[in-house]
Amino acid sequence: ETLSSARFRCKPNSEWRTQIPLFPQEVEACVLS
């Protein structure tokens, strides 16, 4: 999975924690997006 697709899956910062576990770099991308 790419970081781009991870960003789409993350949604708002308040919701990404409830999504399917991400790789550390993907989690960081979510927080920054």
UniProtKB/Swiss-Prot annotation:
<protein>
    <recommendedName>
        <fullName>RNA-directed RNA polymerase beta chain</fullName>
        <ecNumber>2.7.7.48</ecNumber>
    </recommendedName>
</protein>
<comment type="subunit">
    <text>The polymerase complex is composed of four chains, the three other proteins of the complex (alpha, gamma, and delta chains) are supplied by the host cell.</text>
</comment>
<dbReference type="GO" id="GO:0003968">
    <property type="term" value="F:RNA-directed RNA polymerase activity"/>
</dbReference>
<keyword id="KW-0696">RNA-directed RNA polymerase</keyword>
<keyword id="KW-0808">Transferase</keyword>
<comment type="function">
    <text>This enzyme is part of the viral RNA-dependent RNA polymerase complex.</text>
</comment>
<keyword id="KW-0548">Nucleotidyltransferase</keyword>
